[in-house]
Amino acid sequence: MKYNLLNNMKINNKKLKLKLILMMITMKRLNNMNQHNIYKNRYYNKNNNLQYLNKLNTYNNKMYYFNKQLMNNMLIIDNTFNNLLKKMMMSNNILMTNLKFEHRTNSIHIKYYFYNYMNINNDELSKLYNNYMMSINNQMINLLNNDNNSLNNLMTKYYNKKVYINTYKLNYMYLDTELLSQTLTNIYNNNGLSLKSLKMIINKLPFNNDMLLSKNYVNKMNKYNLTINNNLNNNKKDLINLYTLDNKLLDLSITNNMLLGKYLVGSNIQLKGRTLNRNITRTMKMNIMKGTFNNYMYQWSKLNNLYKLNYMSTNINKTNNTFINKNGMFNIKIKLNTI
């Protein structure tokens, strides 16, 4: 009997040890999975940390007034100024985004992006057109900021604050969804937008691989840190002549690579509605996706909740425009993923 009891005790101890070993293995596996998910989220979602620094960077208008009537009046002035400036730009064949307002205590800062969508192949005509556009841009800058009768001075009378207008020229229309949607609507209004023409436009967009970009960025940063750390113990003259001696270090362009929204990674264009083509009587539906949205992570949960603040990450640019024609309505949804 004693021998049987001892055997049973040994067997039970072995079972307990096996259970403890299995529990330790599962705990280690779960910890590794959690760490892997953390690193994966950091890697794919590296731009989202900026959202927590500025909780209002997704809105086009930043203002707060204690008086609601004053706030409504400011919104009306903002909308009218936005529409007037857009009409002025369209008359000069220039596409522009909606104005982004920032109301401060003593000043108002306004910024927008614009793009010249006239493309001329002939060299002589292109030179004439470039000179013409340079003169228009200079006139616009003088109209916005420099002259005594500039828009800044005119808008200060309405706002009773100092107004600063900052313009940014984009060389490519795919860098902003509003500009891309406006170019598509121009093609739609002039020639009619078909599936073939839309695919041609999307195929011309330069898509990049986010994995290669991130690896190149990490390698450049490591090389930069190594060169700096190796030369920390040298003299000041060597540190000053560091960039002139190392030509490869000049080609790193780290600050240029740190810019957000520089490289296009993926696009999703959805069209729905009635076109101007008489042969097509029914509504048209097209959804074309190219590239990747791997780094597309929501801020708060896996589900897309429109009612939460900053539910979209900073690397996603999204627009939704609806246009009315003689046959009905036409809707364009564009989503661009940048890194």
From Swiss-Prot:
Entry keyword annotation includes Mitochondrion: yes
Disulfide bonds, paired cysteine numbers: none
GO biological process, one term: mitochondrial translation
A Pfam family it matches: VAR1
Keywords linked to the UniProt accession: Mitochondrion, Ribonucleoprotein, Ribosomal protein
Superkingdom of this protein's organism: Eukaryota
Subcellular location: Mitochondrion
Keyword Cytoplasm listed: no
One example GO MF annotation: structural constituent of ribosome
GO cellular component: mitochondrial small ribosomal subunit
Family: Belongs to the universal ribosomal protein uS3 family.
Function: Essential for mitochondrial protein synthesis and required for the maturation of small ribosomal subunits.
Protein name per the record: Small ribosomal subunit protein uS3m
Species whose genome carries this gene: Eremothecium gossypii (strain ATCC 10895 / CBS 109.51 / FGSC 9923 / NRRL Y-1056)
